[in-house]
Curated annotation (Swiss-Prot):
Protein's name according to its UniProt entry: Putative late blight resistance protein homolog R1B-11
Compartments where found: Cytoplasm; Membrane
HMA domain: residues covered: 1188-1252
All residue ranges annotated as the NB-ARC domain in the record: 684-736, 786-830
Pfam families: NB-ARC, NB-LRR, WH_DRP
More details: This protein is encoded by the haplotype B genome of the allohexaploid Solanum demissum.
GO cellular component: cytoplasm; membrane
Membrane topology of this protein: Peripheral membrane protein
Length: 1252
């Protein structure tokens, strides 16, 4: 055996030679030496006990199982592996099995091989050896891969088997000459110490008890050396009883909550050790249950024996569940370490309770009363596995166990159904299917449940997971070796009442689903979300009436409730900042969160992803919570009415008290007083002066001086308007600052700090030296205060700017379309969403939170804007904090996916990030792709377009998908029913037609690559099925199926913007299709061919709501318009229409017309435009009418340094439409309604500063 061991172990194991070989060698040497000295025959082993005992004692000190972990050598040479390796492993295990069998069969106490107290454990080891051998045979016979792939596995099997054999050998009890080997209790303590954390208080109890018992035993032997010590226990009762009384006072189970130490060693709490410990406890309890002799000091009365039997049954089930988890968990076992530790703690608690409260009768001393013991056992039964301390993550444990449970249910179900004699209920199959569905839901939702939210439900979660595991395990025999009696015990304990056992699991599934959904909701919402929900509810109930039939009544109630709450949301959207603002915002937030929930429930019902019982329960809870919200709003309204009445009475009293009114006037003028006192000295100004007198005094004081004034804590534009007249403009480079604002400049300037300071270098340097650090440190607090006073409806709009890149100009029309699609805009009767959104934007501009970079020449509306870097950083940070917006950049790894909650909106900078994160973004509402690389869209199509169509399926609630200018696509997504905004880049000439489910899409923007701009794009007929389409912008497109366009054009009643269609015979399509779009507001025709004659006839009453008409390089010659066509037209733009004879004279009668722009047109068009202007202004008194004739100014330059500064300076001039710089020809071309002198003045200043 030693020779075989040497030949194999040096090749397979890392031990050369192993301590086992050393042990056998030294034993043989000692045997030979002893025989030579005493001359005793080989079969005279009487004196060998002393030798062997000493030898084992020596090796026990060196051999530290199970702390020693031997590593198997990596086998490099495949030829070095032969079939003898597997054969050798089986031979070694067979030798061990044979030796252990000898130990088990010896029952003579006189034999030195007799094992008195460890036989049950050795039998268990024997069983494990046999199973290990069978498994090795199974692997060798069934593995398809070459055997050398399993060499490492064989090596580990060999190591473990050798370890077990060495432990049995080293700790084999040997009696003789007064030398006793390690007692079972001491062995257990050693193993316990090596495995368990030092913080367990019951370790002290066990150690101290063992010392007391050992001392008693030695004293007994000394006092009575000739008597049988095993029968001399009468005097021990009193000592043991007192000892337990002492420990009971210190041990407070179940009140003690033990913290689980962090385990660094994966082998520390192995399932094998846990099961061994439970086996010891089960064995001890079995002894108590089997003793029926009342005279025995271990006798337990019947009323307590029943409880011990119940605890015994629970321990057996717990042991089986540990075995189940260790066998079935797919993830590595170290992920379940905390679970095993918990089981170990609870099993140890149970054993300690039994020992401490074991009734001891004798000498008049009676242990704890039966009623108290009953209570202790009841506490244990209810507690089962107790929660660990907060902060320890166990998502992974739950998910692993649930995965194992879910995969085992079909096997358990098949196993039980194959047994015809089993007492199952009729609905067993259905109940098991329900259980599997619930566990699947529980696992999927746990993945997205943050740790902090999970900790609130740890105890309930533990109970549910364990109950589910025991229930399923009782139906499935893992190893096929459990005795029928054990299985019957478990089935009897569970009662096979599946509905009753499933109920707590149902409750937990519902709780976790709700919690997982709630934790991913944003804390900032758009007030228009309820509007979209109400529209969708009607559409969903019409489209999916069969799927939603069982929820019809609940949905109708919810719809009515939300409609009744609409007036309140409208008030919140229009109210200014006031004392009740917080209460209103809280109620509005709760309402919108309920709207999110309803949308989720309806979608889950349609897609059959959640059980009906769960969805119905959820809707009933929503109805109840909406009722509570309405009651809170009613209470708030009552308080508000009371406050208004008090204010009204106070105002009337103040009106009757002139003296008090004077004091209030003086109080309101504190700002002017402070400015005057700083300017002319303290105490020189009287408070009794009125505002106009103070203003005049301040103006006169400042007029002859050069001043720098800093005004803090001013938040209203009206205050700046009142102060403006106090600051004379003497052209002496004086400055006014408002440090509390992010925009520090003169009133109404709206300039950021760096732009204002650039106009005065001396002032800028002084401010930078004296105030720079202070402003930098306080910038976050300043912006935070500005954000805090924002009304509820503006917060989401402002934070949304965080989705844009730094130093980028933001197109207003695009921004407003995004706001509307995100449901940030609350509808109001009589106003369009676009008008309301523009009002929101002007409000933000008025608060100096947004900078205007370009205004329209026609009506002065904002066309482009941007944010200061400080404000942009704030938006990104605050949006992430509010679970509103998350930027996912290039350096974020996949590992971070599950560390974040699902945010409402995601901004990506790399296509790879989108692919990696898509699997965890099922609840995300918006995806906006941004790229710092301006050439990103010019990359080959295959580099980033291939994955888009696949990953979009994961974003089931997607409402905004903005890939504009970044991602090239060759398709239109069709399975996103909630999508309202879609923009992308395309370079195909056609888009494949497929069935579309985009019935909510409102904005469709498809832009072309520069190389493909002039190619005609064929749109599939499914585009015309998008019945809610409002904004359609696709350069140079043509319908693929003309008949489909004619047929479906009446469905597009909501279409308001149609940009750049291409028609081969435009007179047919415009008359038969486009002019039927009754709600069309914007029509842009780009390079349209108007047939051979170039004629376009617009009949009476057509385009009733059209506001903007743009003709861009069309081949139009003769334009005939009926008198009552275009009744609401506001803007007409003619660009590059060089063949057009004139603008029809009927435009002089359109009273709504405000603006005409003519660019690159012939003189007759310019003449007709001037005639329309003259008529509109003089005869129609339309003073707001404006005519812009685009002119071009070309300037030569000799030197050129930076075009960004030039564009920036010239763009600030009014009327500038285009700026072109030609380096080769040294030309600067400026187009628009420009003032040539102003342009030359700016260019001259730049020349002086060496910019040109």
């Amino acid at each position: 055996m030693i020779e075989i061991w040497k030949s194999q172990c040096t090749r397979i194991l890392s031990i050369s030679p192993d301590s086992g070989i050393q042990y056998w060698k030294k034993t043989e040497s000692m045997k030979s030496q002893y025989l030579e000295e005493v001359g005793v025959a080989l079969d005279s082993f009487v004196y060998w006990k002393e030798v062997i005992w000493k030898t084992k004692q020596e090796f026990r000190a060196e051999y530290s199982f199970p702390k020693t972990s031997l590593a198997a050598n990596k086998v490099i040479d495949d030829d070095d592996i032969n079939i003898d390796s597997l054969k050798f492993v089986k031979e070694v295990i067979n030798v061990f099995v044979g030796n252990i069998n000898v130990l088990v069969k010896i029952n003579d106490p006189r034999s030195w091989f007799f094992v008195p107290g460890l036989k049950e454990q050795i039998e268990q080891v024997l069983k494990e050896f046999k199973l290990l051998r069978f498994f090795v045979c199974f692997v060798s016979n069934k593995c398809i891969e070459p055997q050398y792939r399993c060499s490492t596995f064989y090596s580990h099997v060999l190591i473990e088997a050798s370890h077990i054999a060495m432990v049995v050998c080293l700790h084999l009890p040997i009696y003789g000459n007064g030398n006793q080997d390690l007692a079972p209790s001491e062995k257990m303590i050693d193993i316990w110490k090596s495995h368990c954390p030092d913080s367990f208080p019951y370790m002290k109890v066990i150690s101290k008890t063992n010392v007391i018992i050992k001392t008693l035993y030695v004293d007994e032997l000394r006092s009575c050396p000739s008597c049988n010590s095993y029968d001399s226990f009468d005097n021990w009762k009193e000592v043991i009883w007192k000892t337990k009384q002492e420990f009971r006072a210190e041990y407070s189970f179940p009140k003690t909550s033990l913290a689980v130490n962090k385990v660094d060693d994966v082998n520390t709490h192995s399932p094998k050790f846990v099961m061994e410990v439970i086996d010891v406890f089960v064995g001890n309890l079995n002894v108590l249950v089997e003793i029926n002799d009342p005279s025995s000091w271990l006798f337990v009365p019947g009323h307590m024996k029943e409880q011990i039997e119940q605890v015994l049954k629970e321990l057996k089930l717990l042991r089986f569940f540990v075995c189940f988890v260790s066998s079935k968990c797919i993830e590595p076992q170290y992920r379940c370490t905390t679970f095993y530790t918990l089981v170990l703690i609870e099993a140890s608690h149970n054993a300690m309770v039994v020992w401490l409260h074991l009734p001891v009768y004798g000498n008049g001393n009676q242990d704890l009363a039966p009623s108290e013991v009953s209570r202790l056992f009841s506490d244990f039964m209810e507690m089962k596995i107790k929660s660990i301390e907060p902060g320890i993550s166990r998502n992974s444990i739950y998910i692993d166990v649930l995965q194992a449970l879910k995969s085992t249910i079909p096997q358990a179900q098949k196993k039980q159904l194959d047994i015809p004699t089993h007492s199952l209920t009729v609905g067993f199959s259905g109940q098991m299917a329900n259980l599997q569905e619930m566990l699947c839901l529980l696992r999927d939702n746990l993945i997205h449940l943050p740790i902090l939210d999970l900790e609130f439900h740890l105890q309930d979660m533990d109970s549910v997971i364990v109950d589910a595991g025991l229930l399923i395990y009782s139906l499935y025999d893992i190893k096929g070796e459990k005795e029928d009696t054990v299985l019957d015990d478990m089935n009897q304990a569970l009662g096979f009442d599946l509905p009753r056992n499933i109920e707590p699991i149902k409750a937990m599934v519902y709780l976790v689903m709700q919690k997982a959904f709630h934790c991913n909701l944003p804390r900032i919402h758009g007030l228009g979300y309820v509007d979209f929900l109400l529209k969708n509810l009607n559409d969903f109930q019409g489209r999916y009436s069969d799927s939603l039939a069982f929820l019809k009544n609940q949905l109708q109630v919810i719809q009515t409730e939300f409609e009744s709450l609409q007036p309140f949301l409208k008030v919140v959207a229009e109210e200014p900042h006031n004392k009740l603002k917080t209460l209103n915002e809280d109620c509005a937030t709760q309402i919108i969160r309920k709207a999110y929930e309803v949308e989720y429930v309806v979608d889950a019902c349609i897609n059959k992803e959640t059980p009906h019982w769960c969805l119905k329960c959820w809707l009933l809870d929503i109805i109840e919570e909406n009722t509570c919200i309405k009651a809170k709003i009613q209470e708030k309204n009552t308080v508000e009415d009371t406050m208004k009445s008090v204010i009204a009475r106070t105002s009337s009293q103040l009106a009757r008290t002139p003296r008090m009114n004077e004091e209030i006037v003086g109080f309101e003028d504190d700002l002017l007083l402070a400015l005057l006192r700083d300017a002319i000295g303290e105490g020189s100004v009287r408070r009794e002066l009125h505002a106009n007198e103070l203003s005049d005094m301040l103006r006169k004081t400042l007029l002859p001086r050069r001043y720098l004034i800093l005004v803090d804590d001013v938040w209203e534009n009206s205050v700046w308007d009142d102060l403006r007249g106090c600051f004379p403009d003497a052209n002496n480079r004086s400055r006014i600052f408002g440090p509390s604002h992010p925009m520090l400049g003169p009133p109404k300037s709206k300039l950021p700090t760096h732009q204002m300071l650039s106009t005065g270098r001396e002032v800028g340097e002084q401010v930078a030296n004296n105030l720079g650090t202070h402003i930098h440190n306080d910038s976050r607090a300043i912006v935070d205060q500005s954000y805090h006073v924002l009304p509820c409806h503006l917060k989401s709009c402002f934070l949304y700017f965080g989705a844009f890149l730094e130093d980028r100009v933001i197109d207003i029309s695009r921004l407003i379309r995004l706001w509307i699609s995100e449901a940030f805009i609350k509808s109001s009767e009589g106003r369009s969403l676009e008008d309301i959104a523009e009002g929101y934007l002007e409000n933000l501009i008025g608060r100096n939170l947004v900078m205007v970079t370009q205004r329209a020449i026609s009506d002065g509306k904002v066309k482009a804007c941007r944010l200061h870097d400080v404000l942009l950083d704030f938006c990104k940070e605050r949006a992430a904090e509010e679970n509103f917006l998350l930027w996912i950049k290039r350096d974020q790894t996949t590992k971070a996916v599950y560390s974040h909650k699902q945010h409402a909106h995601l901004a990506f900078t790399e296509m790879d990030n989108l692919v990696e994160w898509s699997a965890s973004c099922s609840l995300v509402g918006s995806v906006l792709f941004k790229s710092y690389d301006p050439y990103f869209a010019c990359r080959p199509l295959s580099s980033h377009a291939f994955a888009v169509s696949h990953i979009l399926l994961n974003f089931k609630f997607l409402k905004v998908l903005d890939l504009e200018h970044q991602i090239v696509i060759d398709f239109i997504p069709t399975e996103l029913p909630y999508l309202r905004y879609f923009s992308a880049l395309i370079d195909q000439n056609s888009i494949p037609s497929s069935k579309s489910n985009l019935w909510n899409l409102e904005t469709l923007i498809l832009k072309r690559r520069s190389a493909a701009t002039y190619k005609t794009l064929l749109l599939p007929s499914t585009v015309w099925d998008m019945v809610k389409l409002i904004y359609l912008y696709i350069p140079n497109f043509s319908p693929e199926n003309k008949k489909a366009l004619f047929k479906n054009s009446p469905k597009l009643d909501d279409l308001e913007t149609l940009s750049n269609p291409y028609f081969a015979r435009v007179e047919d399509y415009l008359s038969e299709t486009v002019d039927h779009l009754k709600h069309l507001e914007v029509l842009e025709l780009y390079r349209v061919e108007f047939g051979d004659h170039g004629e376009w006839k617009v009949s009476s009453g057509k385009f009733p709501k059209l506001k903007i008409l743009k003709l861009d390089y069309v081949s139009l010659m003769k334009w005939i318009v009926a008198d009552d066509a275009f009744p609401n037209l506001e803007q007409l733009v003619s660009l590059g229409c060089q063949n057009l004879m004139e603008i029809p004279s009927c435009f002089t009668d359109i009273l709504s017309l405000k603006y005409i722009e003519v660019d690159i047109c012939n003189k007759s068009v310019v003449k007709s435009a001037k005639y329309i202007q003259e008529t509109q202004v003089e005869y129609n008194q339309n003073t707001n009418f404006k005519l812009v004739i685009i002119k071009k100014l070309v300037l030569k330059f000799d030197r050129f340094h930076g075009d960004e500064e030039i564009r920036k300076r010239l763009s600030s001039l009014p009327g500038i439409k285009s700026i072109s710089i030609n380096r080769g020809e040294k030309k600067l071309t400026v187009g628009g309604d420009v003032d040539a002198d102003e342009v030359r003045l700016v260019v001259g200043k730049l020349n002086k500063r060496d910019m040109l």
